[in-house]
Amino acid sequence: MLVYWLDIVGTAVFAISGVLLAGKLRMDPFGVLVLGVVTAVGGGTIRDMALDHGPVFWVKDPTDLVVAMVTSMLTIVLVRQPRRLPKWMLPVLDAVGLAVFVGIGVNKAFNAEAGPLIAVCMGVITGVGGGIIRDVLAREIPMILRTEIYATACIIGGIVHATAYYTFSVPLETASMMGMVVTLLIRLAAIRWHLKLPTFALDENGR
């Protein structure tokens, strides 16, 4: 039940992040709605299509789709000045949503009888897929291709989750919580101390 409600929170926060980016780009209401929804459900959609294990999650149960749409519309109406929001709020809630989405992705892969490598990949895709679609539609460099410790947190958390379950036979729910906590802590540490990955850069001479 806790994971269910955290999933709802994550869906809402991801939708808000899409709407805020659309607002900065001065999109019309339809564009705002599209960016909010694809950010919230895009990763899970890619995952379910890749696993080909039953219908896409929001087709089977439209709760997440409804949450994404309602959150997007409410954000359009209520958040006219994003600067009034505490700076820590969205990044922290985004970190919670990211951790939950990674855990859900790994679980779904294992339930589809996938191996640990694919499970970790599906967890990462669930966590970052929507953001990639959002940034591509907005013609921005996706966050995971920048120096932010974002996908890295997903990968490490997913590995902990998959290893605990597949190698050490930890119950799936317990392994899921372990992976979520690791993902969350890494992401929060990156936010708190502005941790970034080193960059790969070449000058004009290729040096």
From Swiss-Prot:
The keyword Lyase does not apply. Residues 22-29, 80-85, 134-148, 192-207 are cytoplasmic. Keywords: Cell inner membrane, Cell membrane, Membrane, Transmembrane, Transmembrane helix. It is a multi-pass membrane protein. The chain crosses the membrane at residues 1-21, 30-50, 59-79, 86-106, 113-133, 149-169, 171-191. GO terms for cellular component: plasma membrane. Residues 51-58, 107-112, 170 are periplasmic. Pfam families: Gly_transporter. It is found in: Cell inner membrane. The keyword Transmembrane helix applies. Its main location: membrane. Belongs to the UPF0126 family. This is UPF0126 inner membrane protein YadS. It comes from Escherichia coli (strain K12).
